[in-house]
Amino acid sequence: MYKRQIFDYAEQPCHTIPELVELHDTLAGSIPLAADESIRRATDPLRVIAAGAVDRVVVKAAPLGGPRALLHLAEHIPYPLTVSSALDSAVGMNAGLAAAAALPAVADCGLGTGSFFTVDVCEPHQLVDGHLPYRIAAPDPARLEELRAPADREQWWRERLERCYPLATHPANTVTSPC
């Protein structure tokens, strides 16, 4: 357990795992380090843990493949977890909220990013006394139409999904996808 400092941790202050290890050793616990990109962009998300490079982990449900993938990964992480969002819509935020609610213990979460949107596809999750009550947010058809992407962008996303889906659903890839 960490004593309260000016800030809780420095999130992903270095690009590579060797740099994180060096900084972690230099700081000798004076400032806790957290992995984010080293987890969600890695082919082996536990490598940063095995290297002893961090004191905490920031996880985002959507980039990891959803709440189940996040919870599976969490079983192998001996550090405090911060469940955060990847600038998700209120609908996308459902995944992070579900994962955070399912964890036996979770540190403070970074799930209040819905306020960064000027408009969302549904009513955003609202903080109540510093907490986000869990509810399933469903898209509003009128807002979906209003926010619809141009046809060429829609096509780009469809092609990306077709390209990435086989990678994400391959049995050897149970934690993360390179897409």
Predicted regions located by residue number:
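Catalytic core of soluble alpha/beta enzymes
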Residues: 3-98, 120-121, 126-127
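Flexible C-terminal active-site loop/helix
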Residues: 86-179
